């Protein structure tokens, strides 16, 4: 005879009762899946977005969230957080983060109040970041109070940098301790840091690249696996938050000096190279040039001017680290000669460089920079992009020869021959004589 509830031991009955009364877990999203939206739908009423307007209020907030409250009013495609938006999704799926979480922005205000500049209102000068991204909790407070999910895309703070090469320069006396910029014998450097997430105004981005907006939208949609269908179905939405890394700007000296043309300014624009910047691989000059730029920026601030280092997340010339390492293998297995330096990348990636510096000057415009006294870069692409945006470069500073690792001579000579600024002349014939080590 089968056991019944009455014939079972009490502890079994209790356990069984507990199982029966356990609440069924509610689904994260109760409404039907909305794959995309269209401008003609009845509930669609996006908040006005007037890119380049004279004030933040006239421009309007950037609303990208897909919450029930915000979805009809979205005026941007994409998601906050850039590439980290994926981890946000994992946190929600795993039950660690409520999908309707709203941040508490109390005490997160910028540590420096950058004055509003004419460039913030110029739709030709700023197309790849939200000029009001640091002011969201204040200038768009009424939207937050009404329950809409609007978030900052810029954060500003203060910090101390500790860099081994800087400490050595302090120890050998080449970088003095002044107590304001270089703080102590350990080589701590005081900086203002600005983190920026990308916010693209699609008509402006298309213009920078010399293509029409429809072509840009289709390419973004197709090459990202169809992840953002509203790039196609919502031509009325002109703003896109792409799933890529942003930038961090490190300011040495008073931030207000960046826009003061009476002050001397040293600038290093640097694209991420994890292998060298962090782990000090010697196959390229990235970390040596970065630390040289930091030291020169600090010296400029000590001399009464200002320094700026802008660090972009564009790993491996924006080809990615996997592609970069595959290229390294090709190079090392074929003799690693300077004459084939770019060829090996093109064989694998189809292009030698995808950093495309057209969007890079936006952060310089945001700071109000009109001239750079000392450009700590040899890149012709960066130089041309900056000058092409109307910012003067008075002097270009090359990396000192004694900072170039032996195995990176292949890279630097190939780049000089292809157009990098240098007093050194490198011909095509010279490249065939320059080789790196096997491994």
Swiss-Prot record:
It is an enzyme of class 3 (hydrolase). Induction: Strongly increased in response to uracil. Disulfide bonds: none annotated. It is found in: Cytoplasm; Nucleus. Signal peptide: none annotated. The keyword DNA damage does not apply. Zn(2+) binds at residues 273, 284, 286. This is Uracil-regulated protein 1. It comes from Schizosaccharomyces pombe (strain 972 / ATCC 24843) (Fission yeast).
């Amino acid at each position: 005879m089968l056991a019944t509830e009455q014939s079972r031991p009490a502890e079994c009955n209790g356990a069984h009762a507990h199982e029966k009364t356990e609440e069924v877990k509610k689904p994260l999203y109760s409404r039907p899946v909305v794959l995309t939206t269209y401008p003609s739908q009845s509930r669609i009423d996006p908040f006005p977005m007037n890119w380049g307007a004279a004030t933040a209020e006239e421009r309007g907030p950037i609303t990208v969230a897909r919450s029930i409250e915000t979805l009809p009013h979205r005026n941007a495609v994409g998601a906050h957080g850039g590439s980290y938006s994926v981890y946000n999704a994992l946190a929600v799926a795993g039950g660690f983060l409520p999908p309707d979480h709203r941040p508490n922005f109390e005490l997160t205000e910028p540590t420096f109040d950058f004055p509003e500049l004419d460039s913030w209102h110029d739709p030709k000068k700023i197309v790849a970041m939200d000029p009001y991204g640091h002011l969201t909790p204040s200038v768009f407070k009424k939207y937050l109070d009404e329950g809409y999910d609007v978030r900052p895309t810029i954060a500003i703070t203060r910090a101390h940098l500790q860099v081994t090469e800087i400490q050595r320069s302090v120890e050998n006396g080449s970088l003095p301790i002044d107590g304001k910029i270089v703080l102590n014998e350990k080589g701590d450097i005081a900086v203002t840091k600005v983190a920026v997430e990308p916010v693209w105004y699609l008509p402006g981005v298309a213009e920078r690249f010399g293509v029409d907006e429809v072509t840009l939208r289709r390419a973004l949609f197709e090459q990202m696996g169809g992840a953002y269908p509203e790039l196609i179905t919502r031509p009325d939405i002109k703003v896109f938050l792409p799933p890529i890394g942003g930038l961090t700007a490190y300011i040495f000296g008073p931030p207000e000096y960046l826009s003061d043309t009476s002050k001397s300014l040293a600038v290093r624009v640097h694209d991420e190279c994890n292998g060298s910047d962090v782990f000090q691989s010697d196959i390229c000059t990235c970390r040596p040039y970065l630390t040289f730029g930091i030291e020169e920026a600090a010296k400029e601030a000590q001399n009464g001017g200002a320094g700026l280092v802008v660090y972009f997340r564009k790993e491996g010339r924006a080809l990615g680290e996997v592609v970069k390492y595959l290229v390294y293998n090709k190079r090392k297995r074929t003799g690693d000669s300077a004459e084939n330096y770019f060829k090996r990348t093109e064989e694998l990636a189809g292009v030698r460089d995808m950093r495309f510096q057209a969007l890079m000057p936006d952060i310089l415009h945001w700071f109000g920079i009109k001239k750079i006294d000392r450009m700590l870069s040899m890149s012709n692409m960066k130089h041309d992009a900056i000058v092409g945006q109307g910012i003067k470069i008075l002097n270009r500073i090359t990396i000192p020869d004694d900072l170039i690792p032996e195995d990176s001579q292949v890279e630097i000579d190939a780049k000089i021959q292809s157009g990098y600024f240098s007093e050194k002349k490198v011909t095509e014939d010279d490249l065939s004589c320059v080789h790196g080590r096997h491994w």
